[in-house]
A protein has these predicted regions:
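Secretory targeting signatures
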Residues: 1-58
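Accessory cap/linker subdomain of secreted extracellular hydrolases
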Residues: 56-82, 150-151, 155-161, 167, ...
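N-terminal cap/lid segment of alpha/beta-hydrolase-fold proteins
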Residues: 75-126
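Cap/lid segment of the alpha/beta-hydrolase catalytic domain
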Residues: 130-206, 382-393, 579
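A catalytic-pocket lid/entrance helix-loop region that shapes and gates access to the active site
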Residues: 193, 218-285, 337, 344-349, ...
Length: 600
């Protein structure tokens, strides 16, 4: 990768050049108007002299951005033009929230603590919008090894906003969720209590005398989840969210068609152990929901269709559906197509099988997307992009990092938080696995040609899938299918959510299939799908399966956008488990018989 660093001299020359060009354009219009005055009315001439905003590119066109000289001197991207303002000293605030209705035995009142930086134009009485990062990661970690508190600009996400947006007249706020840092109350992992505190933080930021009443949120992973939690409460101050690999609901984060990720067993405990101080004050952080969370993972993993937590614990922690009902803001969705921490199905899956992205889009929400072949990273996080392996985005590294990310986000926030500039194009920027970017109206693309391949046409080895109960599985029996080339003389572009429908016979109330798709010629991984046979209909609703039951497993691959060269086909390798998924609890007692001749 080549890095170009703009110098001060180059920026001065560029600025003078732009001013000179605009002066010449202005003089040409003056001369033209003088000539036209001799022959005709001035109607329209003065309008063209001063310009029509619709006829002039307010920002550089997306297709021309690759020609621009981006500042690549930092660990994150920069806006094209530095703002005229500076950040004032950090300020702090603590306010109390009535929590008497959210926790049965928890505190009736809890405090939210936050820190914020105002831009210098507020000294003149100007009102400004707020960009907030809401997180459990302030003062996070074991005692003596904690991260910074809210009053320190956080590395990465906070620094990115502080450097790029505060100079342009935005306030930056960093908010600690309940039970973390100096915020009191229960650490209610993704629960109703946590959402209530987040909502009141948005309300506080939007109602301050220095605020213009418009709040936008930013952040990745958990800090993307808190954005959906805020949206679920529907604050009128919350105008836009930018979740980057943000969790939309807890159950689909930890389970895919019943297949459990290893972390599902310990997720709540991991967070709780890193947010407490191990002293008497911790008693305030322990509530019934925390104890319930400790048991939710093992119970769901072992009980399947008999799990008592599905209708309470996980439903409470599903936010995207509540936001859809309660909120009317805009969403800029950022997702790594090779992110196996917060999987792409957080964006492209819903209880009825339709992608959430398109559900929001078709309901009239203003939605935009940027989908790159990166992992659990920001679009401009080049230090992480460079470490991706083949089959996991490695083939796209050369064109992956978006040095225009800060500018792209700037144009989004300017419109939705200030009402400045043109409305952003509501499209999807999607990167293919070979690195090529393109623009679609939506994703998965609706104009894609659907093609069905019978697995009966593929050469198969094995018909049983089984293993033992360990993390990642230990295969005893596997199925491999080698399928013929899609085309001998044309490239094939796979784009969307590939379905894998398997005709199977069960041996037990349980059993699981993990399928990896590869390029049959190169062996490069293209994607994966997984399913517990009790969830054979798809989604998260299990059904009891009896021995010798014949079930059609309606599996779906995580989002794939990949190119297949002429003469290449696909290979499917089916094992009991893979990646970081647990093998089924029933182990080698629940093999699954796959019938390729009736599968596709």
């Amino acid at each position: 990768m080549i890095y170009r660093q703009g110098t001060l001299f180059k920026k001065i020359v560029k600025t003078i050049s732009n001013l000179y060009r605009r002066f010449l354009e202005y003089m040409n219009k003056v001369i033209l108007c003088a000539v036209l005055l001799m022959f005709s009315s001035t109607t329209g001439c003065l309008g063209s002299l001063f310009g029509d905003e619709d006829d002039i590119d307010y920002y550089p066109n997306l297709n021309d951005r690759h020609k621009l000289d981006w500042d690549m001197s930092h660990s994150f991207s920069r806006v094209l033009d530095a703002g005229p303002h500076y950040a004032l000293d950090v300020q702090e605030a603590t306010f109390t929230v009535d929590t008497s209705d959210v926790w049965e035995t928890g505190p009736s009142e809890s405090d939210v603590h936050l820190s914020y930086w105002l831009p210098s134009n507020t000294l003149k009485g100007e009102k400004v919008p707020v960009i907030a990062i809401i997180s459990p990661y302030f003062s996070y970690g074991q005692p003596g090894d904690e991260s910074g508190h809210t009053g320190i600009v956080s590395a990465g996400r906070g620094e990115f906003i502080y450097e790029n947006f505060v100079p342009h007249g935005y306030a930056l706020a960093q908010v600690a969720v309940f039970g973390t840092e100096l915020s009191t109350g229960c650490f209610d992992y993704r629960g109703e209590g946590e959402g209530l505190g987040i909502h009141h933080a948005v309300e506080w930021l939007g109602s301050q005398e220095w605020s213009n009443g418009n709040v936008g949120l930013y952040g990745k992973s958990y800090e993307g989840a808190t954005q959906w939690e805020a949206a679920a409460y529907g604050s009128e101050y919350l105008k836009t969210i930018v979740p980057i690999s943000g969790t939309t609901a807890l159950h689909p984060l930890l389970y895919k068609n019943g297949s459990a990720e290893a972390r599902s067993q310990v997720m709540h405990m991991n967070y709780f152990s890193s947010t407490v101080d191990y002293n008497a004050d911790d008693l305030d952080n322990i509530c019934p929901d925390i104890l319930e969370g400790f048991f939710a993972g093992p119970t769901t993993y072992g009980a399947g269709e008999f799990d008592p937590y599905m209708d309470n614990y996980y439903d409470e922690r599903s936010h995207i559906d509540k936001a859809f009902q309660n909120w009317k803001g805009s969403v800029y969705w950022i997702q790594g197509m090779q992110d196996w921490n917060v999987d792409p199905h957080q964006v492209f899956s819903s209880p009825d099988g339709k992608p959430w992205y398109q559900i929001y889009q078709e309901a009239g929400f203003e939605v935009k997307g940027m989908l790159g072949q990166w992992e659990h990273n920001y679009p401009d996080q080049w230090t992480k992009h460079n470490n991706q392996e083949t089959g996991y985005g490695g083939e796209a590294i050369h064109n992956m990092t978006r040095w225009d990310w800060a500018q792209d986000l700037f144009e989004w926030y300017e419109y939705y938080l200030k009402g400045v500039g043109p409305k952003p194009d509501l499209n999807v920027q999607i990167q293919r696995n070979d690195g090529e970017w393109r623009v679609e109206e939506t994703w998965p693309p609706k104009d894609a040609e659907k093609k069905t391949i019978s697995l009966g046409d593929c050469q198969n080895t094995g018909v049983f899938v089984s293993g033992v109960s360990v993390v990642g599985g230990a295969a005893q029996q596997t199925v491999t299918l080698e399928c013929p080339a899609f085309s001998e003389d044309e490239y094939t572009h796979i784009s969307g959510l590939v379905k894998l429908h398997l005709d199977t016979i069960a041996f037990f109330d349980g059993g699981q299939i993990f399928a990896e798709m590869q390029d049959s010629n190169t062996g490069i991984r293209l994607g994966h799908a997984t399913m517990d046979i009790r969830y054979h209909a798809g989604g998260s609703e299990p059904q009891t399966v009896l021995p010798n039951d014949r079930q059609f497993m309606k599996m779906e691959f995580q989002g794939i956008d990949a190119i297949i060269p002429p003469g290449h086909g696909i290979r499917l390798i089916m094992t009991e488990s893979g990646e970081d998924y647990l093998a089924p609890l029933c182990g080698n007692a629940c093999p699954i018989h796959v019938i390729p001749s009736n599968s596709n």
